[in-house]
Regions:
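Anion-binding alpha/beta catalytic cores of soluble intermediary-metabolism enzymes, centered on
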Residues: 1-139, 143-214
Length: 214
């Protein structure tokens, strides 16, 4: 658990290959959010580790989040790949990456969930917004996982939900040989406890062989 350390202090002991904590997966962070205005659990990734992930990094970030969703009881999580718009354009790199990730899912390179994107935030969490824009999607309006374009967008989104929408959350790092609790130094005891509970679920799933360790 991070506690009062700076993030780079804790992760500096995890990220180097020599530390022996790495796997073939990219290390990434997932916020598990309980948002009063949203009818389901919401996972947001990556808002703490990967600053500006590329396509391959995002693929692993999605895989990590899907694995966590399975542990939390979401059998086939719906993954919304966020951007500022819901159409693919060469002017916005995140829309191209979103389209590529969806095709990777179509080809079996990403499994265990349903992916769609690019989707703007409103389309991802509001069925009415998606219908108004005439977006036909199995994910729109009912996303379980939000894959954000970069760390800045994700960090602001998670904190806005907490401070402006009354959300409560937990934070965990996946992709290493062991799960890691990673919360903000400003987080409450309740948030730290919730994060530890999520970590315990992941650790149990690893122990029973139901969580990937690659």
């Amino acid at each position: 658990m991070k506690g009062s350390l700076h993030t780079d202090e804790l992760m500096g002991a995890v990220v180097p290959s020599a530390a022996g904590m790495r796997t073939s997966r990219r290390i990434s962070h997932v916020f598990v959010m309980d948002v009063p205005a949203y009818p389901r659990m919401l996972l947001i990734t990556d808002a703490a580790i990967n600053i500006a992930p590329g396509l391959e990094e995002k693929a692993d970030i999605v895989r990590n989040a899907i694995d966590l969703a399975h542990v939390l009881g979401i059998e086939r999580p719906k993954v919304a790949i966020l951007s500022a718009v819901e159409t693919v354009t060469s002017k916005i790199e995140s829309t191209i990456q979103a389209a590529a990730l969806c095709k990777m899912a179509d080809r079996g390179q990403i499994t265990g969930g349903v992916l769609d994107g690019p989707l703007a935030f409103d389309n991802a969490i509001s069925l009415q917004a998606a219908q108004t824009k005439k977006i036909a999607s199995p994910v729109a309006g009912q996303a379980d996982i939000l894959l954000v374009p970069d760390l800045e967008a994700g960090n602001m989104l998670a904190k806005q939900l907490c401070y402006l929408a009354g959300a409560e959350g937990a934070g965990i790092v996946l992709g290493a040989r062991v799960p890691i609790v990673l919360t903000s130094r400003a987080d409450s005891v309740r948030t730290r406890l919730a994060s530890t509970a999520v970590l315990a679920l992941v650790a149990h799933a690893r122990h029973t062989g139901t969580f990937p360790t690659r």
